[in-house]
From Swiss-Prot:
GO biological process: translation
Cellular component per GO, a single term: ribosome
Protein name, UniProt field: Large ribosomal subunit protein uL10
Record-linked SUPFAM superfamilies: Ribosomal protein L10-like
Role description: Forms part of the ribosomal stalk, playing a central role in the interaction of the ribosome with GTP-bound translation factors.
Any one GO MF annotation of this record: large ribosomal subunit rRNA binding
Transmembrane stretches, start-end: none
Superkingdom as given in the UniProt entry: Bacteria
Coiled-coil region(s): none
Record-linked Gene3D superfamilies: 3.30.70.1730
Stated family: Belongs to the universal ribosomal protein uL10 family.
One Pfam family recorded for the sequence: Ribosomal_L10
UniProtKB keywords: Ribonucleoprotein, Ribosomal protein, RNA-binding, rRNA-binding
Length: 172
């Protein structure tokens, strides 16, 4: 790789690091090329990506960001999994690590915060943004329906009482 190609690679890595909601760093020693290709396809389908790059280039790209500490993770055969949605990259990484024991999640970055391996696993267990929205909407809808029933109950009781009073007067 010549100097110009390295410069292009560094700028591409900087763009990925700055525009992603989350980035996960992992070791892939012992993983076949076919398995990495499969993980790249899975990440693309989920709205993310997987990038294998020379550690030195990634360290240079990270140097100008607010998460310089993550550069310590780039030792050995490392790759990055990234996504705009903060939960997608951790989910992809942890799922791939569960299927492939040689794939080791080291840590990562979530919106300018450096995370360790345990934090990545916790984030991966969360529902994605659409799932969170569905939970919030269902809670709002349930509470709105319950409130409507509570507000209409006294009116219904008054109407029933008046109806009974009218029926009683008609009979007399």
């Amino acid at each position: 790789m010549n100097r110009q190609e390295k410069s292009v690679e560094i700028s591409e890595l900087s763009k990925i690091l700055s525009s992603s909601g989350s980035v996960v760093v992992a070791h892939y020693k012992g993983i076949s090329v076919a398995q990495i290709r499969t993980s790249k396809e899975g990440x693309r389908e989920a709205g993310g990506g997987v990038k294998v790059x020379x550690n030195r280039l990634v360290k240079i790209a990270v140097r100008d960001t607010s998460v310089k500490e993550v550069s310590d993770l780039f030792v050995g055969q490392s790759l990055i999994v990234y996504s705009v949605d903060p939960i997608v990259a951790p989910k992809i990484s942890v799922n791939f690590a569960n299927d492939n024991k040689q794939f080791v999640v080291l840590g990562g970055v979530l919106e300018n915060d450096v995370l360790d391996q345990c934090s990545i696993k916790q984030i991966a267990s969360l529902p994605n943004i659409d799932g969170i929205r569905a939970i919030i909407i269902s809670a709002i809808q349930f509470n709105a329906t319950k409130l409507l029933r509570l507000l209409s109950a006294p009116q219904a009781q008054v109407v029933r009482a008046l109806s009974a009073f009218v029926d009683k007067n008609k009979q007399s």
